[in-house]
Amino acid sequence: MKKIILFGLLPVLLISCDRFGSGRVKNLIDLTPKLEVQSKEKLKFNASQIKKNPFSDQKSKSYSLAKNTIIAKPAFAKGVMYSTDSKGFVSAYSLKEKKILWQTDIAKGVLDRNFNDGGVLYSNGKLYVTNSSRYLVVLDAKSGDEIIRKEYPDIVRNKPVMATDRLLLAQTVSNQLIAYDIKTSKFVWLHEGELETISTRSHVHPVVYDGNVIVSYSSGEIVYLDAQSGKEKWRYNLTKISDIGIPSFDPSVIVTVPIISGEYAYFATSNGKIIKMDLDNGAPAWIKVADDIQSLSLVGDYLLVTNNARQVAALSSHNGKALWVGNLIAQKDRSKRKVRTALFQEPFVAQDGNSFSINVIASNGDLYQFKPDASGFIPSEPTIISITKNVKYHWISCCNGKMHLITGRNIVY
């Protein structure tokens, strides 16, 4: 009898499940708290702050860069793009000749090739490459020949940076910042953060400014050091007691490369904050609560930010207030049952006739443009232009102002 009853209820259960699943499913976009305008203003930019429109009328073409996925933002120097990929190869690509000049295997002898983080630094005719191994590999930029490799105490997942003409800084996953003399091939000093949080989260590389370096550790610390000596000037902890709940493998770290202007550093953190930090004393000038920030740029008096809620916003660099918020999604897509997430590049401001436009490149193949209306205010709805899909990085040439879009394996320009 029980079997008969259950068999009779089965259609009802299936109908109920169908009704339950037919509504719009919440995803990361819905769950991310949205930014709201706090003080509506007309945004104003000087001519020097507005780029020439990098998307020329000439049709772009796609060129192959690598057989494997590019894992870090490429370096550009003297008309050549240098990149490192997921299988341990470093490539040089000529932008003028539109071809690969050389390719070098820096993971010789490694059987399990699955690199996913790293960076390429060009300095004085040499490349300094990391790829989530323990090695810093130095290559001749012209030929691709290996000059030397240096083994570090732990894995290096971030891009190395030059502190001086001979001092290179690299950060390990175990919260060590190590200074390496490229002339003598010796380690000069080491600075360590507190006990690290085990995490797969990648955070930004150290940033050098005026003889000092700002570094973010997975312990939640931000430290400002003398780049020459490694002597600590100040430290600030991103994790406050009020932030601590259930132990997590998601550390509080800086997630956007710090932008330094006028003795202040601007950056977003993984625990939902945008901070303007006074570099003189390590004290925040202001803190703005803003969750899941993807990218950030500073243009004039405004911080332009994007987030996982598919928004772009202009914040006052003076007090952090939101002056304008735009939508990075078409109106027709908002009512869809499953709205896809997207990755957004750093916003930039470009010339648009006699005016300007705020531009955001998205991984879904769309360029979102926001232009002031007749009243001088910028609307929240964008003009959407189809470009290249799966863009991971972009680079605007300082020589001709042209846009270069880089996907996992190709470059479009």
What is the role of each PLM region?
Residues 1-4:
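Positively charged n-region of N-terminal signal peptides that target proteins for export
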Residues 7-13:
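Bacterial N-terminal signal peptides
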Residues 18-75, 100-121, 146-164, 187-210, ...:
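Extracytoplasmic beta-rich repeat domains
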Residues 81-83, 126-128, 168-169, 213-214, ...:
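Conserved beta-propeller blade signature
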Residues 85, 131-132, 172-173, 217-218, ...:
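Structural signature of WD-repeat beta-propellers
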Residues 85-101:
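Beta-propeller domains
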Residues 94-98, 140-144, 181-185, 226-230, ...:
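Short loop/turn segments that connect beta-strands within beta-propeller blades
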